[in-house]
Amino acid sequence: MDTTAISPLTPLGVIPDLKNATSVPFNETACENWKEIHHLVFHVANICFAAGLVIPTTLNLHMIFLRGLLTVGCALFIIWATLYRCALDIMIWNSVFLVVNLLHFIYLVYKRRPIKIEKELSSLYKRMFEPLHVPPELFQRLTGQFCNIQTLKTGQAYAAEDKTSVDDRLSILLKGKMKVSYRGHFLHNIYPCAFIDSPEFRSTQMNRGEKFQVTIIADDNCKFLCWSRERLTYFLETEPFLYEIFKYLIGKDITNKLYSLNDPTLNDKASKKIDRQPSLCSQLSVMQMRNSMASTSDSEDGLQMFLRGTSSSSSLRPGRTSPYLRTSAKMKPIEESVEDDVFEAPSAEKLELQRLP
């Protein structure tokens, strides 16, 4: 009598062969019969994948190379699956990967495209902004939206003392030379790639309605880049990196103007060599010069005193201040409460405490 039990899940009249059922999975798992090696296209595709993954991230264009190699690898896989394997699923999946990597590759190449800077602004970018690692596309945004290039002929005035407002613009000289004077007395020159009105911009950031305390005249046919001050300020608030760049450049420009005041014979080549971090004392000295000339009753004597050099003011005994360094009621000097605390004179109580054992 046959004692083999028929499973309820087994179709009627069909008895499973247990020997064959256990032997087939064993043969497939053991891989006793290896299939032949795939076509060369398959291996080249995998080589592209491997090469893309081992590209070092320190390489400047590593993402472009990675996406490019992945795109080539996916294309080779599609060729292999279509011509040599006839596998529809492999072809579909690699087609999806190909589209994704190709789009990313095009996007990366587009971002790396060379930014065309106007010829008139190329020297400005290379001298002032490129050394500070400002990207060309950011510089293009800075100079392409709310600024324009203006010209002045020889003898024309950029600003007149007590007449021109300082609230309207901020400019950088691109070509030519300008002369800064106070009541007919020459102070210093302004050369290309230098701010024209940086002291006024720095001192009146918190105060509006001020007027220029000096006269700025074109000593040659000049061309300058002019920003709308209000729109520039708003733009810098949205770009913290550029905001810090402008703070540095304006401070450095004020320092260069201070050196020009101390040495009126300083030319453009010598001014290029001045590359120091601007200090508070330097900025205060420039502003005190312009403020004091506008406030002193004997302004002619004060001007001559200042033009002889700032060494006379530094030789004053502690506790005495020069009458020519009084601040103006019109042009308010820079207020830096933190730095002012450093230069406070020690009080008598502090000296007594220091003498105690």
From Swiss-Prot:
Residue spans, topological domain Extracellular: 1-38, 84-89
Extent of Low complexity compositional bias: 309-323
CC annotations in GO: bicellular tight junction; caveola; cell periphery; cytoplasm; endoplasmic reticulum membrane; lateral plasma membrane; membrane; perinuclear region of cytoplasm
Biased composition (Basic and acidic residues): 347-357
UniProt keywords, alphabetically: cAMP, cAMP-binding, Cell adhesion, Cell junction, Cell membrane, Developmental protein, Glycoprotein, Membrane, Nucleotide-binding, Tight junction, Transmembrane, Transmembrane helix
Glycosylation (residues): 20, 27
Transmembrane regions listed in the UniProt entry: 39-59, 63-83, 90-110
A GO BP entry: epithelium migration
Record's bilayer topology term: Multi-pass membrane protein
Any one GO molecular-function label of the UniProt entry: structural molecule activity
Region Disordered, residue ranges: 309-357
Compartment(s): Lateral cell membrane; Cell junction, Tight junction; Membrane; Cell membrane, Sarcolemma
Outcome (variant: residue 272 to A): Abolishes homodimerization and cell-cell adhesion
Superkingdom, taxonomy of origin: Eukaryota
Tissue: Expressed in the heart and skeletal muscle (at protein level). Isoform 1 and isoform 4: expressed in heart, muscle, brain, stomach, kidney, lung and spleen.
Cytoplasmic side: 60-62, 111-357
Assembly, per entry: Homodimer. Homodimerization requires the C-terminus cytoplasmic region.
Function, as annotated: Cell adhesion molecule involved in the establishment and/or maintenance of cell integrity. Involved in the formation and regulation of the tight junction (TJ) paracellular permeability barrier in epithelial cells. Induces primordial adhesive contact and aggregation of epithelial cells in a Ca(2+)-independent manner. Involved in epithelial movement during corneal sheet formation and regeneration. May play a role in VAMP3-mediated vesicular transport and recycling of receptor molecules. May play a role in the regulation of cell shape and movement by modulating the Rho-GTPase activity.
Family: Belongs to the popeye family.
Name of the molecule in the record: Popeye domain-containing protein 1
Source species of the chain: Gallus gallus
Gene of this entry: POPDC1
